Amino acid sequence: MVRESIPKEGENIKIQSYKHDGKIHRVWSETTILKGTDHVVIGGNDHTLVTESDGRTWITREPAIVYFHSEYWFNVICMFREDGIYYYCNLSSPFVCDEEALKYIDYDLDIKVYPNGKYHLLDEDEYEQHMNQMNYPHDIDIILRRNVDILQQWIEQKKGPFAPDFIKVWNERYKKIRQY
């Protein structure tokens, strides 16, 4: 049995995304922990190797801050690009950590947020298809739809990872940790 463990500041961990059927979806090879508690994990990565379920690999193009919360069914990736900060929000199970990686189940729905604050809900067709193929329980559908609403409120209210201070503080912390 693998024990649960909270990653420590400065530690490098893997992030593993699964699908509802238990199959691996995507793996980020290295993320540096900036904050790790029972409820929140914040990390940073840059030019990180990502492996897809079919074995294909690619490398992230820009620095990013990642945000995971144990009570919400989403995670947020804040990407620093030349024309501004973009957010990619995955509707997912709350995270768990063990000695191997930080892990979550990806539930297909995503929200992309642009530097001007506009956002779009993505992959609704994929969600419907996988909900039928993998028999997502009705309760999960209700939880995910409720969390889409929560996430949209956070975006509009600039709350949590969407707050300008959040980005500034955690990006600076990531830069400092990378220097050592």
Curated annotation (Swiss-Prot):
Enumerate the Pfam families for this protein: DUF402 (PF04167)
Any keyword Metal-binding? yes
SUPFAM superfamilies, alphabetically? FomD-like
InterPro entries from the UniProt entry: DUF402, FomD-like_sf, Ntdp-like, SA1684
Active site as annotated: 26 (proton donor)
Q: Which cofactor does it need?
A: Mg(2+)
Example GO molecular function: magnesium ion binding
Residues where Mg(2+) 2 binds: 108, 110, 123, 126
Q: Where does Mg(2+) 1 bind?
A: 90, 106, 110
Q: Which domain of life is it from?
A: Bacteria
Q: What is its EC number?
A: 3.6.1.15, 3.6.1.6
Q: Which UniProt keywords apply?
A: Hydrolase, Magnesium, Metal-binding
Top enzyme class: hydrolase
Give the reaction(s) catalysed. Answer: a ribonucleoside 5'-triphosphate + H2O = a ribonucleoside 5'-diphosphate + phosphate + H(+); a ribonucleoside 5'-diphosphate + H2O = a ribonucleoside 5'-phosphate + phosphate + H(+)
What family does the entry list?
Answer: Belongs to the Ntdp family.
Chain's role:
Has nucleoside phosphatase activity towards nucleoside triphosphates and nucleoside diphosphates.
- In its UniProt entry, what is this protein called? Nucleoside triphosphate/diphosphate phosphatase
Give the classification, highest ranks.
Bacteria, Bacillati, Bacillota, Bacilli, Bacillales
